[in-house]
């Protein structure tokens, strides 16, 4: 029981630190929150979020899967965390 708990705790910590590292990397790339929404040039259908600088809110959109820019977040939480919405 303790072993299972420890393994779960290690996995959760690993995912957490990996996501923090990703957030930090996006921040140092420049002000991605002011970039326009870009759906990309491919025909995929991936639900994503972008920061709309006119409304000051994270807004859902459908990403095509390639191209695009940094203002493209997999979750609403990630968009809000990076762009402080």
From Swiss-Prot:
The record marks 43-44 as: Reactive bond for trypsin. Its main location: secreted. SUPFAM superfamilies: BPTI-like (SSF57362). Thermostable. Complete trypsin inhibition at all temperature ranges (25-100 degrees Celsius). Keywords: Cleavage on pair of basic residues, Disulfide bond, Ion channel impairing toxin, Nematocyst, Protease inhibitor, Secreted, Serine protease inhibitor, Signal, Toxin. Pfam families: Kunitz_BPTI. Residues 1-22 form the signal peptide. GO terms for cellular component: extracellular space; nematocyst. It is found in: Secreted; Nematocyst. The keyword Nucleotide-binding does not apply. It comes from the Eukaryota. Disulfide bonds join 33-83, 42-66, 58-79. InterPro entries: Kunitz_BPTI, Kunitz_BPTI_sf, Prtase_inh_Kunz-CS, TFPI/VKTCI-like. The record marks 74 as: Important for the stabilization when complexed with trypsin. Residues 23-29 form a propeptide. The keyword Phosphoprotein does not apply. GO terms for molecular function: ion channel regulator activity; serine-type endopeptidase inhibitor activity; toxin activity. Residues 33-83 form the BPTI/Kunitz inhibitor domain. Serine protease inhibitor that also shows protective effect in a cytotoxicity model. It binds to all proteases tested (trypsin (Ki=52 nM), alpha-chymotrypsin, cathepsin G, kallikrein, and human neutrophil elastase). It significantly increases neuroblastoma cell viability in an in vitro neurotoxicity model, being a consequence of an effective decrease of reactive oxygen species (ROS) level in the cells. It also seems to protect cells by inhibiting ATP-induced purinoceptor (P2RX7) activation. Belongs to the venom Kunitz-type family. Sea anemone type 2 potassium channel toxin subfamily. Negative results: does not show activity on all potassium channel tested (Kv1.1/KCNA1, Kv1.2/KCNA2, Kv1.3/KCNA3, Kv1.4/KCNA4, Kv1.5/KCNA5, Kv1.6/KCNA8, Shaker IR, and Kv11.1/KCNH2/ERG1). A synonymy between H.magnifica and R.crispa is controversial. This is PI-stichotoxin-Hcr2i.
């Amino acid at each position: 029981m303790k072993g299972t708990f420890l393994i779960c705790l290690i996995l959760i910590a690993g995912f957490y630190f990996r996501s923090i590292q990703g957030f930090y990397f996006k921040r140092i790339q420049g002000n991605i929150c002011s970039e326009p929404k870009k759906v990309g040039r491919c025909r995929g259908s991936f639900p994503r979020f972008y920061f709309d600088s006119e409304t000051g809110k994270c807004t859902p959109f459908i990403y095509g899967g390639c191209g695009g820019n940094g203002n493209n977040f997999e979750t609403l939480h990630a968009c809000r965390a990076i762009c402080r919405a």
